[in-house]
A protein has these predicted regions:
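Cleavable N-terminal export/targeting peptides
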Residues: 1-33, 220, 388
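Outer-membrane beta-barrel pore domains
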Residues: 2-4, 32-68, 101-107, 120, ...
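Intrinsically disordered/low-complexity terminal segments and short unstructured peptides
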Residues: 16-17, 24, 59, 77, ...
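Compositionally biased, intrinsically disordered low-complexity segments
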Residues: 18, 24-26, 181, 243, ...
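Outer membrane beta-barrel
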Residues: 64-196, 283-322
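A short local loop/turn or secondary-structure capping micro-motif enriched for an aromatic residue
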Residues: 96-97, 137-138, 173-175, 201-203, ...
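Loop-centered beta-sheet repeat module
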Residues: 174-221, 225-241
């Protein structure tokens, strides 16, 4: 073996991977690269949020202020066994949320939030997935978690096709069981609609904030409020119906979604019959540019691509199953986002949000009590990357 090849292999072993190392013949290396694909993506952001509607660990000095850094990195490995079979694994760093005066300990470490096999029956346009993956349903509000759901997914068509019908059954991280069905239909090149059903089930045990003998709240080492378990564990469900649409105009795209939790008691044991505002969620958004996905879609656009979005949201605390950090539970208000692709695979975006609490949200990370009607200003600056 040549000295350069030995050095390349040694470096790869020190880095924890041997994928793509050029220690074989040129023909063998080309064969591997044709089948193998690696992607590195992630976000580093700084947020300032006076009312903790943003998601991520904040200050741990019990001041109730919400500001700090948030970061995650993912490495996705795809191996095309042949034209019909694909193996995918994604390594997730977890979220490094370091607030002011808080050391970044990252106690959970990295983990695989995706690990699945996909088989495509191209003749019948059917696609089967077995393993750990996730999904984005509706227009990304009612369910948006692309990992940590282990089970089976069957779909007629792909999500980018004019017609796609998808069925999913699996167990989510944390013990929740999820069923979903979704039909997405394009009526023209500019218009598409979705009709979605999502059901989640879990064993839930009620909790109450922990207090000392004087009635003062007790906190964990990271500044979060301690909770005590009360009562027996019960099997609870969430059951969502959801409708959404996307319409492209000249230079502007409109997207909107409405969802409602049909359950009498949700997975947290909350009685929802008289909580119409808390069990429903909706948003409408107008954006310019090719995408409103600033974290994942914008980095892969041409350098110099600009995108701007204006969104009004009214999201009840129990009106969605799981969403990304661009939606805020129990809040209504305006969210503005501007982003630009600065390098190949690299973009930046800036967010301003003005949100009002729809209900009494209980205690925030540091014991701050959020009241109905409270307003919050949200500022976020993010660096997004996706390298292939």
């Amino acid at each position: 073996m040549k000295k350069s090849a030995k050095l390349s292999l040694a470096l790869a072993l020190m880095m924890g991977t041997t994928a793509g190392v050029q220690v074989m013949t040129n023909n063998a290396s080309a064969e591997v690269s044709d089948k193998f694909r690696m992607e590195l993506n992630g976000v580093s952001s700084y947020f300032h949020d006076t009312d903790k509607v943003y998601y991520g660990q904040t200050r741990t000095d019990n001041t109730g202020l919400g500001k700090g850094w948030n970061n995650y990195t993912r490495v996705q490995l795809t191996y095309n066994v042949d034209k019909d079979v694909q193996a995918v694994a994604r390594l997730h760093s977890n979220y490094d949320n370091a607030g002011d005066f808080a050391a970044n300990k990252n106690t959970s470490g990295a983990y695989f939030d995706q690990s699945y096999i996909k088989y495509s029956d191209r003749k019948n346009n059917l696609h089967y997935i077995v393993g750990k993956k996730g999904m984005t349903l509706g227009q990304s509000m009612v369910y948006n978690s692309t990992g940590n759901l282990t089970g089976v997914q069957v779909s007629y068509g792909n999500f980018w096709d004019p017609t796609c019908f998808q069925l999913t059954y699996g167990d989510a991280k944390g013990g929740n069981r999820v069923w979903s069905a979704q039909l997405t239909q394009a009526t023209s090149k500019a218009t598409s609609f979705n009709a979605t059903y999502v059901r989640g089930e879990t064993l839930y045990q009620k909790t109450t904030p922990a207090t000392d003998r004087n009635g003062n709240l007790q906190f964990n080492n990271d500044g979060t409020v301690k909770f005590n378990y009360t009562g027996e564990a019960k099997r609870e469900t969430d059951s969502f119906v959801d409708f959404g649409a996307k319409v492209k105009f000249h230079g502007v795209t409109m997207v909107g979604e409405w969802s409602r939790n049909q359950a009498n008691y949700n997975q947290k044991g909350k009685y929802l019959d008289k909580m119409a505002g808390e069990r429903q969620a909706w948003f409408i958004e107008f954006y310019t540019g090719p995408t409103n996905d600033f974290g994942s879609g914008l980095p892969v656009q041409k350098v110099g691509t600009h995108a701007f979005s204006v969104r009004w949201q009214d999201v009840g605390r129990y009106g969605t199953y799981v969403h990304n950090n661009t939606f805020y539970d129990g809040k209504k208000g305006l969210r503005l986002d501007y982003g630009v692709t600065v390098k190949k695979g690299l973009s930046v975006d800036f967010v301003y949000g003005r949100m009002q609490a729809k209900d009494k949200a209980g205690y925030g990370n540091s014991g701050y009590k959020i009241k109905k009607g409270d307003w919050s200003n949200i500022f976020v600056a993010a660096l997004n990357y996706k390298f292939r």
